[in-house]
Amino acid sequence: MKIVEVKHPLVKHKLGLMRETDISTKRFRELASEVGSLLTYEATADLETEKVTIEGWNGPVEVDQIKGKKITVVPILRAGLGMMEGVLENVPSARISVVGMYRNEETLEPVPYFQKLVSNIDERMALIVDPMLATGGSVIATIDLLKKAGCSSIKVLVLVAAPEGIAALEKAHPDVELYTASIDQGLNEHGYIIPGLGDAGDKIFGTK
């Protein structure tokens, strides 16, 4: 499995700000979107381009444009919505597919409760967005849904990832790609990432 830890100084700086315990909801939400945008930049670096002739200010000019690769952004509800706008800044024409998952706090297993995928998802590259890759359960279950619907080109974008979640994802879906702003220390006894970000969903939606 391709694993990319994005170590750009801007990513490191913004993620560091997000780790502050008393960060405001507004600021956390802004930073989640900004880091999501930077991760998208990395995740789409291999998109093919083609030469197209357009009408410029001084006549015809040859430019590069993305070659036919359609994209769907797949936020995992609810926290994934906090990264979605940043992703769309880079790929504004992407379609949105939504998957609802929550984690059973006793078993730590994902529980699906909603899904609405674009009709031609089998023709698109899916960018799954979720702030945290902890045990990996929610992301793995989401990939299961996408593959069942015919999607074969899948990339996962997360703010922070635990080694345990990475290992589980690689075992279940070695053909996907993972892009993260940080590979953190690991999980505590409650299944939360250390040092992590706390509850990203609560911080994004102001329910902490």
Curated annotation (Swiss-Prot):
Cofactor binding mode and count: Binds 1 Mg(2+) ion per subunit. The magnesium is bound as Mg-PRPP.
InterPro entries: PRibTrfase_dom, PRTase-like, Upp_B, UPRTase/APRTase, Ura_phspho_trans
Chain positions recorded as uracil binding sites: I193, G198, D199, A200
Binding positions for 5-phospho-alpha-D-ribose 1-diphosphate per the UniProt entry: R78, R103, D130, P131, M132, L133, A134, T135, G136, G137, S138, D199
CDD domains given in the database record: PRTases_typeI
Cofactor(s), by name: Mg(2+)
Keywords: Allosteric enzyme, Glycosyltransferase, GTP-binding, Magnesium, Nucleotide-binding, Transferase
GO biological process, one term: UMP salvage
Control of this protein's activity: Allosterically activated by GTP.
Stored SUPFAM superfamilies: PRTase-like
Reaction catalysis annotation: UMP + diphosphate = 5-phospho-alpha-D-ribose 1-diphosphate + uracil
Pathway this chain belongs to: Pyrimidine metabolism; UMP biosynthesis via salvage pathway; UMP from uracil: step 1/1
E.C. code: 2.4.2.9
Function: Catalyzes the conversion of uracil and 5-phospho-alpha-D-ribose 1-diphosphate (PRPP) to UMP and diphosphate.
Family label: Belongs to the UPRTase family.
Protein name: Uracil phosphoribosyltransferase
Biological source species: Escherichia fergusonii (strain ATCC 35469 / DSM 13698 / CCUG 18766 / IAM 14443 / JCM 21226 / LMG 7866 / NBRC 102419 / NCTC 12128 / CDC 0568-73)
Source species taxonomy: Bacteria, Pseudomonadati, Pseudomonadota, Gammaproteobacteria, Enterobacterales
Gene name linked to the record: upp
